[in-house]
């Protein structure tokens, strides 16, 4: 693993050492042998090692793949564990959480007790509704903290943000460990767990700067680790069920190999100010690539170094060649139609996933629920695959796949059979695999990296707060009005997921060409002033001697041959 970068670079050099005639006839590759061809093929799969961002210094000079492994372990153990909600709620039920809401007779026996009469995990509907509220509350808090953590990440750097997130995780699980029937601490426990989720996840994304040209893949690798963390509650609940260990002991044990481990990794291997973009203060952006559309190519070079007026003006011109929205201000990007639509898309995703998690035991048998618990941690598999697909064909097509998975999740849930329940569970696994990562990849490839943390934080905040709508949908409509029948809300969610295709189509249209809606630039005057300064700067004539978008100018701002946008 330590030599993977050098091997990839060597293979790339050997492939490009052929003369044109030899390469076309295959003689050069035959001379190099099968080993060289294999290394060349692997070099095409691995992230590039020949760009400045891939060669920057790391803590203790660790190989970037080792660092990625450490970050992935932290995300796996302390990521969005509360998304494994069916298992986590089962632990709360086993600990008699909110049992005081259920009526008792004179002898202190619960009447009725749905555990005995219907084989449910909960005693009464009131207890079930109270526990299920915790999920949307935790999701909303996590998204709220995502906005704050994004700002902290931009201002304070990854180290302090990661430490804060892990300490919040630790406090939350300690509260959960010491919750009892007489002293229920579930609300503060889940609040702290929610606060720590994205606060400990977002700082690990700084490693994407070590893999220029593969940011989509790296984000989804970390996202896959977060998806695998859905299995942590399943493991803990299995220990409680099969080994007679109390919820308290299991929760305390988890604190050591979860949050405490995260603190140690942060102190040793997390940079204080993020990874330097590269020696010149530049980073390599990667707009979505795909087939049949004509935006500028990927890996465009954005210069963030301080310089004279002419250098800044030249940078303004270069950024405009790629995508005007990238060079605009935060507020311009925030009020753009692209950002509005991706946030709207995520709001519907949060509604669909939240209600499904809450009502799973109402829609399916316990056998299907058990399959959901097992499949959710395996969502890291489609997460990685879809991440690579996003790099190849673009995030818009991935959004289409994700929405189709969500739609089929609800379509299969209408049929009251275990077979269709298993199909629904499989679709839900795919739907959850890129729950927030799909937004991360879209924002990363569309907007300025200077505002990455704030934009994804605000999108998560909006989706999280509005996910609370599913609480009254579940409690007031499904449980109270419809006597536990989720059919009405299932139909509503299915309709919303159908409407989602409209937003996806518009986002694809905005990426497909120079639509007048592309930028929604309310700072047009500022852009015109910047362009004027560029034209009046010293040396402007030399810089503009080539036609706009010509090969000579594009060669200065691209690292690899351009590909089409998805």
Curated annotation (Swiss-Prot):
It is a multi-pass membrane protein. GO terms for cellular component: membrane. Induction: Expression is not affected by changes in arginine or lysine concentrations in the environment. Glycans are attached at residue 476. Its main location: membrane. Keywords: Amino-acid transport, Cell membrane, Glycoprotein, Membrane, Transmembrane, Transmembrane helix, Transport. The keyword Membrane applies. It comes from the Eukaryota. The chain crosses the membrane at residues 65-85, 137-157, 158-178, 187-207, 216-236, 250-270, 334-354, 367-387, 392-412, 423-443, 455-475, 489-509. It is found in: Cell membrane. Disruption phenotype: Repeated attempts to generate a knockout failed. Conditional knockdown results in impaired parasite proliferation. Reduced uptake of lysine and arginine. It catalyses: L-lysine(in) = L-lysine(out); L-arginine(in) = L-arginine(out); L-methionine(in) = L-methionine(out); L-leucine(in) = L-leucine(out). Cationic and neutral amino acid transporter. Transports lysine with high affinity. Can transport arginine, methionine and leucine. Does not require inorganic ions, such as sodium, chloride, potassium, calcium or magnesium, for transport activity. Belongs to the SLC43A transporter (TC 2.A.1.44) family. This is Amino acid transporter 6-1. The gene is ApiAT6-1.
């Amino acid at each position: 693993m330590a030599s993977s970068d050098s091997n990839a670079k060597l293979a790339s050099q050997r492939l490009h050492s052929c003369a044109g005639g030899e390469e076309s006839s295959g003689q050069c590759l035959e001379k190099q042998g099968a080993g060289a061809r294999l290394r060349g093929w692997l070099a095409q799969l691995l992230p590039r090692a020949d760009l400045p961002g891939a060669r920057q210094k790391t803590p203790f000079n660790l190989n970037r793949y080792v660092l990625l492994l450490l970050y992935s372990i932290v995300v796996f153990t302390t990521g969005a564990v509360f998304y494994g909600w069916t298992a986590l709620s089962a632990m709360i039920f086993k600990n008699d959480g909110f049992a005081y809401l259920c009526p008792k007779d004179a002898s202190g026996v619960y009447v009725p007790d749905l555990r005995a009469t219907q084989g449910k995990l909960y005693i009464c509907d009131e207890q079930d509704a109270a526990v299920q509220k915790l999920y949307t509350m935790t999701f909303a808090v996590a998204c709220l903290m995502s906005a704050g953590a994004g700002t902290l990440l931009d201002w304070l750097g990854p180290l302090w943000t990661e430490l804060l997130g892990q300490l919040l995780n630790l406090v939350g699980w300690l509260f959960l460990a010491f919750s009892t029937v007489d002293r229920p601490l579930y609300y503060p426990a889940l609040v702290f767990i929610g606060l720590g989720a994205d606060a400990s996840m977002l700082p690990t994304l700084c490693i994407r700067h070590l893999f220029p040209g593969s940011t989509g893949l790296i984000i989804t690798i970390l996202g896959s680790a977060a998806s695998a963390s859905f299995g942590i509650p399943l493991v803990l609940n299995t220990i409680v069920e099969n080994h007679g260990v109390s919820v308290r002991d299991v929760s305390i044990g988890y604190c050591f190999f979860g949050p405490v481990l995260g603190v140690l990794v942060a102190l040793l291997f997390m940079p204080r100010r993020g990874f330097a973009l590269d020696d010149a203060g530049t980073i390599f952006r990667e707009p979505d690539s795909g087939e049949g559309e004509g935006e500028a190519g990927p890996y465009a070079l954005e210069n963030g170094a301080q310089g004279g007026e002419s250098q800044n003006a030249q940078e303004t011109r270069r950024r405009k060649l790629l995508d005007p929205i990238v060079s605009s201000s935060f507020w311009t990007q925030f009020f753009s139609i692209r950002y509005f639509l991706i946030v709207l898309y995520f709001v519907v995703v949060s509604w669909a996933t939240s209600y499904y998690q809450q009502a799973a035991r109402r829609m399916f048998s316990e056998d299907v629920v058990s399959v959901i618990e097992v499949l959710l941690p395996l969502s890291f598999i489609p997460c990685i695959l879809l991440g690579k697909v996003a790099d190849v064909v673009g995030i818009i097509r991935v959004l289409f796949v994700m929405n189709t998975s969500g739609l089929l999740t609800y379509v299969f849930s209408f049929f009251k059979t275990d077979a269709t329940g298993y199909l629904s569970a499989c679709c839900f696994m795919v739907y959850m695999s890129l729950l927030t990562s799909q937004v991360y990849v879209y924002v990363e490839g569309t907007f300025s990296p200077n505002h990455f943390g704030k934009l994804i934080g605000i999108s998560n905040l909006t989706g999280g707060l509005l996910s609370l709508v599913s609480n009254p949908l579940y409690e007031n409509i499904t449980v109270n009005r419809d006597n536990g029948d989720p059919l009405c809300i299932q139909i509503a969610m299915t309709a919303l997921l159908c409407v989602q295709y409209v937003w996806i189509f518009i986002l694809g249209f905005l990426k497909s060409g120079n639509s007048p809606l592309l930028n929604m630039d309310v700072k047009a005057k500022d852009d015109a002033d910047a362009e004027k300064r560029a034209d009046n700067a010293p040396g402007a004539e030399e810089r503009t001697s080539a036609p706009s978008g010509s090969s000579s100018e594009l060669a200065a701002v691209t690292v690899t041959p351009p590909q089409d946008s998805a």
